[in-house]
A protein has these predicted regions:
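Glycine-rich anion-binding loops of enzyme active sites
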Residues: 60, 96-190, 338
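Active-site glycine-rich loop that binds ribose-phosphate moieties when present
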Residues: 148-166, 226-243, 292
Length: 372
């Protein structure tokens, strides 16, 4: 039986590459004066003199990291790149070049893959990133996306970057924005078994930059399903915030991909410190609290995929950062706790409840190979 003429198997690898390159060019993500991209054996890029390179890689596998009955191809492309850009933001760097490799079964619709590239290309162009190439291979069972992003330190900071290993007792523990939004979206999908809603979110945003799409979770109105789905499907990489943290003199940051407690545990381990998190200081939107009155704390601390920045700062750095946030129209940072000396008995993180009780909490970051 011949393959469906609208699928990859019928079009072929090299014709698909040409179509994908055209899709990137249409959204302005395929060329730059300092880069030789798609069409050669390797890309050539000229980094800015005096900067330090930052490299990150992520893979997304169907039915492990995403479900195409829950998300559109365009949203999948956006999120696949956004997770990599978020890693660069967490280093206090700027992304410059991306490569995308696809593992395809052959049954993927051509129109879907073009939309995937339009989604990631639109986000790339919004942040000055060029998609410089990649690879296409056959996959016998399921779709896989593998992205690498190369960035560089901002030229005006003498190569300074943010890492996880320089937190000190007495530092304030801070996040760049609200927690629990993406987990609320995933919980909505899991509870509702929404199938077919994937197009509704994308269609309502047609003609808008995906990079700027964001839900209204201010609490001024009742939350809607789409509010949470947008937060889950289209995270915003906090590149400008990472730059502001470096400018203010910050040293430590990471992005919140595996949940607050899980990611904070990584900072504690790398820096050899402990931490106290204040329940009453967690910036959880009213809409999340209203929709999940018994579970908002779990969503905010263990849900993951918020892609806000978690960082530490001394008082002087925080004062400078607040001023920079006002000047650059960035959200005010939220202080959620303090870094402490490592406790004598593990775990290193304690949650101070509203009533003043302190509870030890485990990290519990997502583990691809954990049982259960």
């Amino acid at each position: 039986m011949p393959p469906d003429p609208q699928t990859v198997a019928a079009l072929g690898e090299f014709a698909l590459i040409d179509r994908l390159a055209t899709a990137l060019a249409e959204v302005g993500a395929a060329a730059a004066p300092d880069l030789l991209g798609i069409g050669d054996d390797a890309a050539i890029w000229m980094p800015t003199p005096g900067t330090r390179a930052v490299i990150t890689t992520d893979s997304l596998i169907a039915r492990i990291h995403f479900r195409l009955d829950w998300t559109s191809w365009r949203d999948l492309g956006h999120k696949a790149l956004a997770t990599n850009l978020s890693d660069v933001a967490a280093m206090g760097a700027r992304p410059r070049v991306a490569t995308v490799s696809l593992a395809l079964t052959g049954a993927e619709p051509i129109a879907g893959l073009l939309d995937l590239y339009r989604g990631l290309g639109t986000l790339a162009a919004a942040h000055g990133v060029v998609v410089a190439g990649g690879d296409i291979v056959a996959s016998p069972e399921r779709l896989g996306l593998h992205l690498t992003v190369v960035g560089e330190s901002w030229p005006d900071f003498d190569g300074r970057l943010l890492t996880r290993d320089r937190a000190r007792p007495g530092d304030l523990l801070v996040v760049s924005g609200p927690l629990g939004r993406s987990a609320a979206g995933l919980e909505t999908l899991l509870r509702s078994s929404i199938v077919g809603r994937r197009s509704s979110v994308s269609d309502r945003s047609a003609g808008k930059s995906l990079a700027s799409a964001s839900p209204d979770l201010s609490g001024d109105r009742r939350p809607t399903t789409d509010d949470f789905l947008v937060a889950h499907h289209r995270p915003t990489p906090q590149i400008a915030y990472g730059r502001a943290i470096v400018a203010a003199g910050g040293r430590v940051a990471m992005d919140l991909s595996d949940g607050l407690f899980g990611d904070l545990a990584k900072i504690c381990a790398r820096s050899g410190v402990g931490a106290i998190v204040e329940e009453g200081a967690l910036p959880v939107p009213d809409a999340v609290r209203a929709a999940f009155p018994d579970e908002w704390l779990r969503l905010a601390t263990r849900g993951g995929e918020d892609y806000e920045l978690l960082f530490t700062a001394d008082v002087a750095t925080m004062d400078r950062l607040r001023d920079l946030c006002v000047a650059r129209d960035l959200p005010a940072p939220a202080i959620i706790g303090i870094i402490t000396a490592p406790p004598a008995i593990a775990p290193p993180i304690r949650l101070r409840r509203i009533d003043g009780r302190e509870e030890p909490v485990g990290g519990g970051a997502f583990d691809h190979f954990a049982g259960g």
